[in-house]
């Protein structure tokens, strides 16, 4: 069932109660405004999740930033549907260092940069050796191919990040994982 109420705590609590009474098998955390800053998003998510039954699936249909994705997982969200990788790629931005750092490939200083996006990355874009300079050229010339290469890289990066976070949670190393991630920002 859908949890609604936006930033209004009383409405969200009433919504949670109604969903629980309906006996559904999971929660859809909807009604969270898309224009929230990370701090307000975190406040709302951290108010909602402790009130949800633990054995039920928790689905977030939209996380718009890197920090929101991490915060949602740490708050107990099980499934996130995010367009972060695509939005960044469409704007010429590559996610590197497990997504903690961004490269704005439309900027001129990438014009002659022969490095791949991320030497530590095993995505098809990086393995094929596409340089930052080539990607810069494709992006600044509005090539759809450049956006596709960035999307492929960004999806791989975020999937690897979530896999690492999942493993850290499983091994009770979440705090250490997040600290290392934040040091890379």
Residue ranges and their predicted role:
Residues 1-118:
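Glycine-rich phosphate/ribose-binding loops and adjacent secondary-structure elements
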Residues 118-185:
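C-terminal extensions of enzymes
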């Amino acid at each position: 069932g859908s949890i609604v109420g936006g930033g209004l705590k009383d409405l969200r609590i009433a919504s949670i109660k109604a969903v629980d009474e309906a006996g559904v098998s999971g929660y859809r955390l909807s009604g969270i405004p898309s224009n929230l800053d990370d701090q307000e998003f975190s406040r709302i998510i951290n108010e909602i999740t402790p009130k949800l039954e633990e054995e039920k699936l928790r689905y977030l249909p939209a996380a718009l930033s890197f920090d929101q994705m991490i915060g949602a997982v740490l708050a107990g969200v099980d499934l996130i549907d995010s367009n972060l990788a695509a939005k960044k790629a469409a704007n010429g931005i590559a996610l590197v260092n497990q997504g903690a750092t961004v490269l704005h490939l439309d900027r001129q200083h990438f014009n002659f940069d022969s490095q791949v996006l991320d030497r530590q990355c095993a995505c098809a874009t990086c393995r094929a050796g596409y340089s930052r300079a080539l990607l810069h050229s494709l992006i600044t010339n509005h090539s759809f191919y450049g956006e596709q290469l960035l999307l492929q890289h960004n999806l791989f990066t975020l999937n690897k990040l979530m896999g690492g976070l999942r493993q850290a949670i499983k091994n009770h190393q979440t705090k250490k994982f997040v600290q290392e991630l934040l040091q890379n920002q």
